[in-house]
Amino acid sequence: MQLNPHRAGRVWMLGGLILFLAGLGRAADVRVVGSDLLGLEFSQALYACAVREGIPLAVALDGSRPGYDQLASGRADLGLLTLPAGENPDPAGFTAVPLAWHRVVVIVAAATPLDRVTLADLAAVFGTDVPVSYNRWGDLGLRGEWEGRPVTALAAAQGAGLSEQIFRHLILQDRPLKSPLGRYTSAADLAFRLEGDGRVLALAAALPPQVAGLKLLPVAVRAEDPAFSPTPENLQSGDYPLRLALRVVFRRTAALRVLPVVRFILSEEVARVLERAELVPAPRSVRRQHALALEKP
């Protein structure tokens, strides 16, 4: 019997954890919880770090909200949480460090003569129950042969990542996307649709890799504001608005025990893992600054 990849990953992690704890002969010293979108590679990297450091480690990446509950109740020491700004643990009892960013990018064909969009534009293209609805490129300011062309709006298949949830929360106040709406099932499917239809305007977590002829549109909060691209620096500063932080959160009382793990999580090795999971790590200088600050007594 063959396991599917997700189940095989869970079995691998559980087996590795049992062997690691049994070899050390004691219960886990550091209990890590949080986002279920980080992937098997991230968990493997954490266990490899724990072996190097000699730290008994238990990892349960079952979701940010369950992780929050476990941190708040004292059943976990360290969390990797993606939560709206007002829902992070009390700073009096926890330290929170931004590690990376989930982002929503806006993609069009490179030949599309549009060089920026605003949040209101995106709401009008993708939203329901909004003051105005956009269906043609002329609504976005294009003229000439583009003015009457329909916009083909695309979003990821429901349940695929966080891009739709982030967009709905930040732009539509949690209202649903309009229906009917085109949906893509993978990065390859998105690339195929963008290459085959120059009228597409798509929301995604990242630009499909190794695909020419596409571009990311800078986003402005309002029409009179400058537009920003989704670079690490613009995500960190908040200039690019379509983003949600992945934070490392740990109990202050557990700071000494979790420090080696936190130091590793802020490393370049983990940054590369996060990139492969379609997150944008905080700039290296920012992560290094946080790591140095945590070393101080």
Model-derived features: where do they sit?
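Bacterial N-terminal signal peptides that target proteins for export
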Residues: 2-13
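Flexible loop/hinge segments at secondary-structure junctions
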Residues: 28-297
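Bacterial N-terminal signal peptides
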Residues: 12-22
